[in-house]
């Protein structure tokens, strides 16, 4: 009887075990927006091959172009403010129905011509300055995902480099002109229109650079 209980307990416990599944990284294949046109192959030259007079520049959906990212940005701003204000007011009743001659009134209020005398002043000085400089250099290959009616190319590229469980991810999106592509099939990032360039990290080092959730809550709630 005891053996049956032990076997039944083991069966129940095995049902509570959660199998660890391997995390699969997302595929880097971009969805092509425009399908490649179908050409009829000839007996000598294939439609998928480069023409006799064509160069190696990207021009079709699915072609690869190398983006040389050289982004530099800097900005600075300085402001100063100074304000001041002062005011003074005085009021009195030197003559009021002859009461100023009464000794009772004058003894209680001293001088009716100086019943009220007040002054106020305020001053504010403020200054601030900010400066920022950013530099990003990288080289990444992107894929042509669409060819616009004016022959401009929409590109998208992503590169993920993992070192010691730390991922460095570079992504580039935008629109380029075929004429800006060099003979080496490269293009500088300054010629990418509507450019979306990002460089981010994922891993324990990136997590340690962020404040904890409790500190974020306190920063939002702290009124001073």
Curated annotation (Swiss-Prot):
The listed locations are:
Cell outer membrane; Bacterial flagellum basal body
Known role: Assembles around the rod to form the L-ring and probably protects the motor/basal body from shearing forces during rotation.
The terms under GO molecular function for this entry are:
cytoskeletal motor activity
Superkingdom as given in the UniProt entry: Bacteria
Family designation: Belongs to the FlgH family.
Q: Coiled-coil annotation: which residues?
A: none
Q: Where is the lipid attached (S-diacylglycerol cysteine)?
A: 16
* Species the sequence originates in: Trichlorobacter lovleyi (strain ATCC BAA-1151 / DSM 17278 / SZ)
Lipid-conjugated positions (N-palmitoyl cysteine): 16
Q: What is this protein called?
A: Flagellar L-ring protein
Fill in the subunit field for this protein: The basal body constitutes a major portion of the flagellar organelle and consists of four rings (L,P,S, and M) mounted on a central rod.
Q: Name one GO cellular component term.
A: cell outer membrane
Does the keyword section mention NAD?
no
Q: Which keywords are on file for this protein?
A: Bacterial flagellum, Cell outer membrane, Lipoprotein, Membrane, Palmitate, Signal
Q: Which PANTHER family match?
A: FLAGELLAR L-RING PROTEIN
Q: How does it sit in the membrane?
A: Lipid-anchor
């Amino acid at each position: 009887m005891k053996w049956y209980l032990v076997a039944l307990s083991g069966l129940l416990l095995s049902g509570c075990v959660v199998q660890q599944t391997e995390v699969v990284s997302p595929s880097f294949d971009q969805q092509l927006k425009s399908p490649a046109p179908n050409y009829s192959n000839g007996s000598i030259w294939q439609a998928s091959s480069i023409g006799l007079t064509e160069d190696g520049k990207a021009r079709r959906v699915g072609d690869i172009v190398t983006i040389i990212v050289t982004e530099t940005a800097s900005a600075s701003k300085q402001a100063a403010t100074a304000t001041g204000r002062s005011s003074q007011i005085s009021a009195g009743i030197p003559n009021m129905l002859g009461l100023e001659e009464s000794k009772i009134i004058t003894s209680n209020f001293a001088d009716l011509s100086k019943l009220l005398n007040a002054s106020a002043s305020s001053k504010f000085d403020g200054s601030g300055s900010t400066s920022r400089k950013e530099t990003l250099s990288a080289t990444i290959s992107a894929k042509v995902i669409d060819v616009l009616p004016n022959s401009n190319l929409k590109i998208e590229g992503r590169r993920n480099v993992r070192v010691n469980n730390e991922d460095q991810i570079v992504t580039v999106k935008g629109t380029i002109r075929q004429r800006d592509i060099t003979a080496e099939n490269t293009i500088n990032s300054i010629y990418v229109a509507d450019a979306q360039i990002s460089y981010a990290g994922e891993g324990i080092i990136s997590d340690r650079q962020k404040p904890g959730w409790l500190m974020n809550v306190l920063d939002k709630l702290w009124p001073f």
